[in-house]
Amino acid sequence: MNILVINAGSSSLKYQLLNPETGALLAKGLCERIGIDGKFTYKPQVEGKQVLDAVDVAMPTHSEAIQAVLNALVDKDNGVIGSMQEIDAVGHRVVHGGEAFAGSVLITDEVMKALEECIPLAPLHNPANITGINACTAVMGKDVPQVAVFDTAFHQTMPAKAYMYALPYEYYEKDKVRRYGFHGTSHKYVAGRAAAMLGKPIEELKLISCHLGNGSSVTAIDGGKSVDTTMGFTPLAGLPMGTRSGDLDAGILEYIMGKYGYDIKEMVSILNKKSGVQGVSGVSSDFRDLEKAAEEGNARAQLAEEKFAYEVKKYVGAYAAAMGGVDAIIFTAGVGENDKGIRAMVCDGLEYMGVKLDPAANDVRGKETVISAADSKVKVLLIPTNEELMIATDTAAIVKGN
């Protein structure tokens, strides 16, 4: 079964063609500068096929981008499938499903209406996701099933005590202001892999998943269900990130805005784009640059790393308390998979909880493995995330179910 996975942005479109049954990746690539001057990248994962790297292709809209993807996939010389009929379904990453969607869903006219209603919750992302769906329908026709897979859906199992903000209740009732959480597809994927690695049913496990990258979140997963997560109404909440502040005292906004005359848009832009480890370090939002600067003695870079790891550690402790224990801690995403120093800093001091890192096992990048010591009561796992495979797997399951 071949699933085309689409992640549509406002002027870009990432794609992968996968077989979720075997886990095989057939091709992947990127359409950039849609509506501007169109750059197309195609990377077939089959030997002897030619890579196209940022070649000029006219893509006035997302429909032309989808057509370019299909043309490349079925190209007689460099294609990886014989015809479009070999694509069984399309799986779309959709950022926000609000309270309407607690799982992935076959896209229908009713679903499209509900997606439109979620736009106020994710005004930057959902319109682009909807555009991607419409482009696939326009080019591929209505006979090819399409499935929406939401970043937020995995967290819809959170109890009210975890998702409710202590604001006047009418903001939740009328405006749906609550914790939604993000990175759900990633957290769901690594939780499933953790259960497989530990050889136990996921229903019996208490897991803490640390998705650490330019955007970061920690999720408490009890019996395979998300029970709490650090990101909130927006992806700005929780941990400090590459350029996002994470949690802070809301009174700071009033203080800074009053002192410098910023309006709310300027303030939110500072919180989203100029804060996090970049703001603290003054060096970079990239943890590789931070590590280099810290090693060279840059005190602010060292502080940024320490602050980040400290906040992750705090949430690990909090979520272990919330679940009444923890069986395994998972590190995933760019920083989680590749930065042994951050992993060590997070685990340092958690020995009282039964966490014991093996320094030799931790000296690894991007490989699925156990990095805790043999006698560690709580297992520490490094699991590379694969959101596209999770989207393809969900899509296949829904299409087969229907």
What name fits each language-model region?
Residues 12-59, 232:
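Short glycine-rich, Thr/Ser-proximal phosphate-binding strand/loop in the N-terminal lobe
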Residues 72-88, 196-201, 316-327:
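Phosphate/pyrophosphate-binding loops at sites that engage ATP/ADP/AMP, CoA/4′-phosphopantetheine
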Residues 73-125, 145-147, 153-162:
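Short beta-strand-loop/turn "lid" adjacent to the catalytic site in phosphate-handling enzymes
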Residues 154-257:
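Glycine-rich phosphate-binding loop of actin/hexokinase-like ATP-binding domains
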Residues 222, 227-263, 269, 333-364:
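Catalytic phosphate/nucleotide-handling subdomain of diverse soluble enzymes
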Residues 302, 306-322, 326-327, 336-402:
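Internal helix-turn-beta structural module
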